Amino acid sequence: MALKTWKPFITVVSLQFGYAGLSIIAKFALNQGMSPHVLASYRHIVATIFIAPFAYFLDRKIRPKMTLSIFFKILLLGLLEPTIDQNLYYTGMKYTSATFTAAMTNVLPAFAFIMAWIFRLEKVNVKKIHSQAKILGTIVTVGGAMLMTVVKGPLIPLPWANPHDIHQDSSNTGVKQDLTKGASLIAIGCICWAGFINLQAITLKSYPVELSLTAYICFLGSIESTIVALFIERGNPSAWAIHLDSKLLAAVYGGVICSGIGYYVQGVIMKTRGPVFVTAFNPLSMVIVAILGSIILAEVMFLGRILGAIVIVLGLYSVLWGKSKDEPSSSFSDMDKELPLSTPQIVLPSKANAKMDTNDASVVISRPNTNESV
């Protein structure tokens, strides 16, 4: 029971380590001149190749019928995160740093909460103190993001970082750092990411097969992001060149870990914990990226950005505190979802159903679960 309780926490923490690793690898690849649009395209081509065989063989007996409504939802999912968010995210990272990008993505839980509230995936009662904490925390989180962008402050000396490398990224890529532009792109990307997470939760209610949904998202996302990359990089075929270097590593790592496994795992967790829980551990990624970025990429830290990141984390955990007060009700809901599975097991041994074959029994058992998920 203890392991079952902690499994979602361990899983999302592991995801944050995966995301942190990609931030460092992707920034290194971008510093080497890789196009952010080509990276988004290659990432989801790799993800499709990786996840599709698992989805085909493991879901072929349980995959629901594809409807036009579900297809359009998946088409939108492929547009929101693999295409729009990834293009904006990597472009914003090119204008800033890996640490700044990781810190800015802490606004994601706030945006996810607002959208979950709008789509009634999150319980909010403005008269209750825990709901007020969610709303206040969201406002504080956005304020912290603005503080990071506007206030720079003095340089924080780190023994392993070289302050003379502050403009290193700009000289390597030919792109001058622009915090305002970079922060704006990342923030818009986070809005799309939050929309993706909430829409994924909605889609799973009518198409409750996480592997197949992930495969479809990656496949359609790879097509859409490739179209965008071909348009932006037209007349520049060298942008698509890739060798055994950091560019290939970024595409493979991002495709397998962050898209293939990441989309699937967050889909499994949000079916019981909700979309806000999935995004709640982003500050851990920020801490990991800040440490690794200063060591590997020689990134420097400024007081204003650290203060802004602290404000973001305080706001985030105000949201999480309010979210924690909803856990008893969601746990009760989870128990209700498990009840139909036990009911057929009591009915099946009765005389009326003694002659029922195993195929019919499986139908009786699975049907309540499907209805419940819908």
Curated annotation (Swiss-Prot):
Lipid bilayer topology: Multi-pass membrane protein
GO MF, any single term: L-glutamine transmembrane transporter activity
Coiled coil: none
Family statement: Belongs to the drug/metabolite transporter (DMT) superfamily. Plant drug/metabolite exporter (P-DME) (TC 2.A.7.4) family.
Name of protein: WAT1-related protein At2g39510
A single cellular component GO annotation: plasma membrane
Transmembrane regions listed in the UniProt entry: 9-29, 38-58, 64-84, 99-119, 135-155, 182-202, 212-232, 249-269, 284-304, 306-326
